[in-house]
UniProtKB/Swiss-Prot annotation:
UniProt organism field: Haemophilus influenzae (strain ATCC 51907 / DSM 11121 / KW20 / Rd)
UniProt key word Magnesium: yes
Alphabetized HAMAP family for the sequence: PyrE
GO annotation, cellular component aspect: cytoplasm
MF terms in GO: magnesium ion binding; orotate phosphoribosyltransferase activity
GO biological process: 'de novo' pyrimidine nucleobase biosynthetic process; 'de novo' UMP biosynthetic process; pyrimidine nucleotide biosynthetic process; pyrimidine ribonucleoside biosynthetic process
EC number: 2.4.2.10
Catalytic activity: orotidine 5'-phosphate + diphosphate = orotate + 5-phospho-alpha-D-ribose 1-diphosphate
Protein name (record): Orotate phosphoribosyltransferase
Residues holding 5-phospho-alpha-D-ribose 1-diphosphate: 26, 72-73, 99-100, 103, 105, 124-132
Entry-linked NCBIfam families: pyrE
InterPro entries tied to this protein: OPRT, Or_phspho_trans_dom, PRibTrfase_dom, PRTase-like
Enzyme class, first EC level, given as a word: transferase
Amino acid sequence: MEQYKRDFIEFALSRNVLKFGEFTLKSGRKSPYFFNAGLFNTGADLARLGEFYAAAIQASAVDFDVVFGPAYKGIPIGTSVSVALFNRYGIDKPVCFNRKEVKDHGEGGNLIGSPLQGKILLVDDVITAGTAIRESMELISANQAELAAVLIALNRKERGKGELSAIQEVERDYQCQVLSIIDLDDLMQFIEQDPRYSSHLPEMRAYRAEFGV
């Protein structure tokens, strides 16, 4: 596992963004872990978070023109990612985000920041049902732009209601890569190697066996 992945897991644990235990998800599933990126909520947290996204971008070598953060959670992520890309790697990319309510005065429209043009890197925290991605694709298509890739913090790698995960459905429907800072396999490897968390292994393995893709 790359060092930035291990560091990100440690960071998420230290902020209680990532927890092990027993949690009931919105789907009703009982999960042995929970991830809530909304708890990255200070200036220092967002600065570090942006650096982890930037590290994943560099590792993937994805080719893109604009960073797009869909409302609402994607807005601070997109901003912190674009700042981190410049500060850490000297890469200066435009950033764009949308408002969910179309504004009919002032600058109008539903996009703020850079025009949505060229190859778009969409950044968000997680993909649960893929709804935000589908809404974003309508915006991207309406602006004659192209989705280069999606980058999220965590890929749970678990099935939705069918045989595919929401992420696999997005990849199939939009012919794009979905990248992540970490995924379930990284989490499994981390707890296998860390005695602080190894007691959660049986539940994690059982969960992956039942719901994993």
